[in-house]
Amino acid sequence: MPSKKYADYKGAEPYFELVRSALGDLVDGEHFFDVVADNIAYEVRYDLGWPRVIRGRDDLMAQFLGYVGNIRLRSADKLIANRADNSRVVVIEYEVHGTILATGAKYENRFCSIIELENRKIARWRDYMDSLAAWNALTAGAH
C-alpha cells in the first residue's frame, strides 16, 4: 500500500513495489524512495525524455513526478532478480504495463536494471529498456 508521503507517485507504484520486493532484506525502508541513497546516481541508457544521469534523491523524485504525469502503470511483473558481488549488486529484469495519459495508448515495456547497493541503500542504478516499445507507445496516434 502506498504511503501518504508518496501519494503523488501512485502512477508508478507497481514499479516501486516490484523493485522493493526484488531487493528484499538487502535494503532498509518500506518505499522505493526510502531505499534510495540521498546521493544516488540513476543512469538511464536511453534518450526518451529523461536526463542521461540523475544525481540525488530529490532530483530522482522530481523526474518521477514527470513520469507519473505522463504514464500510469497498472502492473509490473515477470521479475527475474540475480545477485552478484556478495549481494552488493542486484540485476533485475522486469516488465511494466500501463497507459500513456495524453492519448490513452497502451504502454508495455521491458527493462533490465543494474543496482549497486551501499550501506543498505541504492547508491547507483543503470537502466536499459526496450526503446522501440516506449517510442511506439509515446507516439501512438502520431503515425
Model segments located where?
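A beta-strand edge to alpha-helix "cap/lid" segment located at domain peripheries
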Residues: 1-7, 65-143
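Short, low-complexity N-terminal intrinsically disordered segments enriched in polar/charged residues
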Residues: 1-38, 142-143
